């Protein structure tokens, strides 16, 4: 008969919820990266026990894929999972508001009519190297200008995320680009869309 296993520490619900959210956020930041269970636990600053429990639930949910190599797990995200739109987009939007981007736009661009989040960060398809694209409509009659707003030193688990402003006036923007912007999320102001 095998000796009884030493009982493991209990993992409380709040700890699991924090680990669950940290795990999601890590894979939002690095959706194409494969990582082992131990490295993931270290990266999200969580116990291996709690991380394993959360990872197993995310595998059942089909948010994560698991390759077993010997005794090790290699984890990757399923980028087609609904969490990348239902949970990642609101997470990205919260990050934009908390990062001070809107305030920085007002300091750099006098009297914008509308400030719009568009591109991959808006759709939740951003990768580890992606920048954040912000469209700013102005009343002037100038051609499109793309200018760097700055770099967010830390955005979740990502570091040094560039933010670019696409400053445009209605009369001088290419139609397909305007359609892309119009399908973005208006962060502040009012974007009038004409048919």
Where are each of the predicted segments found?
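Short, well-ordered beta-strand segments
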Residues: 133-135
């Amino acid at each position: 008969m095998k000796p009884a296993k030493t009982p493991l520490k209990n993992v409380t619900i709040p700890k699991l919820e924090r680990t669950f959210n940290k795990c999601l956020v890590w894979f939002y930041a690095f959706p194409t990266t494969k990582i082992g269970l131990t490295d993931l636990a270290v990266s999200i600053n969580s116990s291996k026990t709690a991380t394993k429990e959360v990872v197993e639930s995310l595998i059942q949910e089909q948010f994560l894929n698991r390759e077993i190599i010997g005794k090790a797990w290699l984890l990757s995200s399923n980028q087609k999972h609904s969490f990348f739109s239902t949970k990642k987009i609101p997470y990205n939007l919260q990050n934009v508001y908390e990062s001070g981007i809107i305030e920085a736009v007002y300091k750099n661009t006098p009297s914008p009519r509308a400030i719009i989040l568009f591109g991959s960060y808006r759709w939740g398809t951003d990768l580890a190297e992606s920048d954040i694209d912000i469209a700013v409509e102005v009343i002037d009659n100038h051609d499109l200008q793309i200018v760097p707003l700055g770099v967010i030193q830390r955005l979740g688990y990502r570091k040094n995320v560039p933010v670019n402003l696409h400053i445009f006036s209605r009369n001088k923007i290419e139609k397909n680009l305007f359609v892309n912007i119009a399908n973005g999320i208006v962060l502040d102001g009012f974007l009038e869309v004409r048919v």
